């Protein structure tokens, strides 16, 4: 079950307050205090809801309210408090005795905002409008600079990766591997035929002929059959 309304809408007055209603509300509060706003209208003989009585008392009828226009000192104090607190009008009103939050809010929107704009100050940030434009341009320039720097870093990283890959990859040799294994094997058929031919001619070609054993690299062998006796 929800909370019951503060008053019956069918039995309450709406609209502007009359002087008679103001006098009744002031007389009751002076005699009994504020008390409970929900029960105050009926006790004071008013056909108003509790919320309407409370706002009427706080904003218009309480004796400590300051009447008249805001002073220059109050304007500067409101500007300073707004730069610190923002749109917290109740807290700002607590620093200005005799002024209500609703009164200060209306005065801000109708007067102080225009005053700040005429000074070239942003009412929201309390900074110079020109400084805000310059700051935005500076941020844009910095963002382009960062983009160029990132692009250069990317190119440098790619180049370094390529160099590292080339260093780690095996170098292909220009010449094939040479088989240096030496083996003693029978001579091919061409060498045998050549040796037999020399034996038949008896080395008459006019040049010294080595036998088969000497051709194998065996020096001073008893099996040497060179015609000039080189092996011996």
From Swiss-Prot:
The keyword DNA-binding applies. It is found in: Nucleus. One of its GO terms (molecular function) is DNA binding. Expressed in roots, stems, leaves, seed pods and flowers. The keyword Transferase does not apply. Residues 9-61, 62-116 form the HTH myb-type domain. InterPro entries: Homeodomain-like_sf (IPR009057), Myb_dom (IPR017930), Myb_TF_plants (IPR015495), SANT/Myb (IPR001005). GO terms for cellular component: nucleus. Keywords: DNA-binding, Nucleus, Repeat, Transcription, Transcription regulation. SMART domains: SANT. Residues 37-61, 89-112 bind DNA. Transcription factor. This is Myb-related protein 308.
């Amino acid at each position: 079950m929800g909370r019951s309304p503060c008053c019956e809408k069918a039995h309450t007055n709406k609209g502007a307050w009359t002087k008679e209603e103001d006098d009744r509300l002031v007389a009751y509060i002076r005699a009994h205090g504020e008390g409970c706003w929900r029960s105050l209208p009926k006790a004071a003989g008013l056909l108003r809801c509790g919320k309407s009585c409370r706002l009427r008392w706080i904003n218009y009828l309480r004796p400590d309210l300051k009447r008249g226009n805001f002073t220059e000192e109050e304007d500067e104090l409101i500007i300073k408090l707004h730069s610190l607190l923002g749109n917290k009008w109740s807290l700002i009103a607590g620093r200005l005795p005799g002024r209500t939050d609703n009164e200060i809010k209306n005065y801000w929107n109708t007067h102080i905002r225009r005053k700040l704009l005429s000074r070239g100050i942003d009412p929201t940030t309390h900074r110079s409008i020109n400084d805000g434009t310059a700051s935005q341009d500076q941020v844009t320039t910095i963002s382009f600079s960062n983009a160029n720097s990132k692009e250069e870093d990317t190119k440098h990283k790619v180049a370094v990766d390529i160099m590292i890959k080339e260093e780690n990859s095996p170098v292909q040799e220009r010449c094939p591997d040479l088989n240096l294994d030496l083996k003693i094997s029978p001579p091919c058929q061409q060498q045998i035929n050549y040796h037999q031919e020399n034996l038949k001619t008896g080395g008459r070609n006019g040049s010294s002929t080595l036998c088969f054993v000497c051709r194998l690299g065996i020096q001073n062998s008893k099996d040497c059959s060179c015609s000039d006796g080189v092996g011996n």
